[in-house]
């Protein structure tokens, strides 16, 4: 981040809840923002994260959750994909270093497209992976001027009930997108075995079966495609 200090503002937060609230505030103000935390940190940040799913965003908002299957350096092995389901969040799951870069760009675009936060779900082996990554040209995101929208961002019951209905409409649109998006596609090889994968499980399956199986590789795993 120090390489881009003239263009990108970053800070440490006292805890994950504060980090999420700061990122949400930046999004409301009209800029793209993200906060990153390990899996147990999302427990701390759950309060604002559940609510921003209702309110939506202005600038793109991405919440990175790093899970730790196998408990290599964590106090539990919780699966934060369940948070995405409970909070009704759009979720992306990259399987490689290249996809981490590509999906992050997509996450901001989808956040703004659907007026919704995106949970960017990674795991230990993805976070510790190394690989050659093609970066491409830097693209500056447009600043969206702040507008005072009480009915959108003040989640008092009178507003929140309407937000809840609106959220279901957005989720239906996300599901339709998931059915055809380029990161949810079959990979055909031998058709005797089929494996449905997401995240690092795609790499494990390919290492085990190679071309002796076909794969349905899901990069956008929630809302679930029908």
Locations of regions flagged by a protein language model:
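Thiamine diphosphate
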Residues: 1-97, 125, 182, 188-192, ...
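Flexible, low-complexity linker and terminal segments
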Residues: 94-226
């Amino acid at each position: 981040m120090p390489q881009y200090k003239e263009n990108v503002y970053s800070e440490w937060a006292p805890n994950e809840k504060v980090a999420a609230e700061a990122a949400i505030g930046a999004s409301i103000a009209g800029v793209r923002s993200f906060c990153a935390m390990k899996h147990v940190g999302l427990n701390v940040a759950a309060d604002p994260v559940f609510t921003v799913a209702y309110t939506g965003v202005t600038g793109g908002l991405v919440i990175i959750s790093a899970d730790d299957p196998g408990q290599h350096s964590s106090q539990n092995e919780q699966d934060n994909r369940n948070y995405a389901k409970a909070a009704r969040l759009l979720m992306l799951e990259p399987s490689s270093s290249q996809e981490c870069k590509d999906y992050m760009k997509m996450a901001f675009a989808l956040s703004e497209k659907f007026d919704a936060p995106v949970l960017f779900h990674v795991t230990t082996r993805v976070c510790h992976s190394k690989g050659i990554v093609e970066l491409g040209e830097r693209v500056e995101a447009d600043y969206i001027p702040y507008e005072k929208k009480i009915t959108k961002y003040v989640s008092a019951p009178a507003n929140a009930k309407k937000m809840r209905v609106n959220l279901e409409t957005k989720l239906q649109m996300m599901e339709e997108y998931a059915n055809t998006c380029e990161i949810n596609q079959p990979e055909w090889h031998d058709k005797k075995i089929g494996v449905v994968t997401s995240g690092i499980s795609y790499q494990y399956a390919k290492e085990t079966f190679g071309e002796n199986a076909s794969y349905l590789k899901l990069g956008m795993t929630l809302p679930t495609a029908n």
